[in-house]
Amino acid sequence: MASNPPLDLTLTPTKGDGRTLEQWFTTFHLVSVVVDPFTNESAWILDTAARILRDFAGAAVRVNWVVTGTAEDARAFLGPLASEFLTFADPDRSYVSALGLQHLPAFVFLRVDGQVVAVAEGWNASEWREVAEAIADTVVWSRAVIPAPGDPQAYVGTPALV
């Protein structure tokens, strides 16, 4: 079960200085895809997740990756996706732990007040679609098509905390 993270938790982008969640929330909700750069399960979802993040890029949300590794790990794992989207490094998994995530990859929607609105862990198209619908309803945006041709079959993912 996901939990609301503390607003004083610092998220550090791969480029730039870290800021607290409260500072990241000054204008936009956070829509994160959380991945582990050391697992196949997270690699399998990159194309699908990038497509979904692109669908919300123009909405009143801050779309981003959270990579459970260093900034270098994030850039190596995501390649050009690390530059296309805001990317946070979470090498000690403090953000993952604060959210109470059990499996990665995960799709997380946090409102500007820091409340978890919706979470999907592992890859299950219907669960990710529910998160996308919660985002679309909140910001009055078009719904992402999930699943789309080429998306992987459902899988549980890997343990979020190791």
Describe each PLM feature range.
Residues V34-T48:
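Conserved redox-active cysteine motifs that mediate thiol-disulfide chemistry
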Residues R62-T68:
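Short internal beta-strands
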Residues F28, V35-F38, T70:
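Short pre-active-site segment immediately N-terminal to redox-active cysteine/selenocysteine motifs
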